[in-house]
Amino acid sequence: MAGVLDEALTTVFRTPVRLRAAGRTDAGVHATGQVAHLDVPGTALPNAYPRAPHVGEAEFGPLLRRLGRFLPTDVRVVDITRAPAGFDARFSALRRHYVYRLSTAPWGVLPQQARYVTAWPRPLDVEAMAAASRDLLGLHDFAAFCRHRENATTIRDLQRLDWTRDGDLITARVSADAFCWSMVRSLVGALLAVGENRRPVSWCRELLSATNRSSDYATAPAHGLTLVGVDYPPDDQLAARNLITRDVRSR
């Protein structure tokens, strides 16, 4: 997605620009709440929208419309605003929110939902999955649930991980200050092993003592996962949050 947007923005502004997103999602993962920023030279702004906004239209309304014409139908930019001083889409963020959806229906997933719901046509003990999830909340080293990246910390503050069932549809809602590579899909994959009674509830907690990614579970399919939101502090705290996050991530 980032490459597609960079190409479209470069075309619109007629100068090379690079978008920086709040979260770098795995291939196949969806995002309805992604936030990103880019720095644009002032001289390039007239290239993007030579016409003034319509009466009552937002400042970047013309840019929003024009950008939409350069993007494929499965990529949309829904809002553009001026960023406050000190804002960084990635490092100023307080937390990210993800949703994972799967269906246990024996016949699979409805065609109109198949792009964002994983078919899991077998019984799941949601109460056991919820109990195992509670053991994972808080500040931990999630190395067992992260793909290795050189010099990258795997310590994260997992603030929410709960499950709900609505008929055959099972939904996980996951929030943390940040997620390492494939962490959400790995958490879901491990918890599915608990839900199928292949592992006890205590197993996920035991994985937290590992220093490397575990091979005892399968990562959940990417298409069931969606980034649904990113939280930021008040404008006057953005720069400080940026510095704090950079310091933590560099350790």
Swiss-Prot record:
UniProt GO BP: tRNA pseudouridine synthesis
Pfam family, one: PseudoU_synth_1
Keyword line: Isomerase, tRNA processing
EC category name: isomerase
Keyword Coiled coil belongs to the record: no
Top-level lineage group: Bacteria
Positions of the catalytic residues: D26
GO molecular-function term, one example from the UniProt record: RNA binding
Catalytic activity: uridine(38/39/40) in tRNA = pseudouridine(38/39/40) in tRNA
Classification via CDD domains: PseudoU_synth_EcTruA
EC number: 5.4.99.12
UniProt-annotated binding residues for substrate: Y98
Quaternary context: Homodimer.
Family affiliation: Belongs to the tRNA pseudouridine synthase TruA family.
UniProt function note: Formation of pseudouridine at positions 38, 39 and 40 in the anticodon stem and loop of transfer RNAs.
Official protein name in the record: tRNA pseudouridine synthase A
Organism: Mycolicibacterium paratuberculosis (strain ATCC BAA-968 / K-10) (Mycobacterium paratuberculosis)
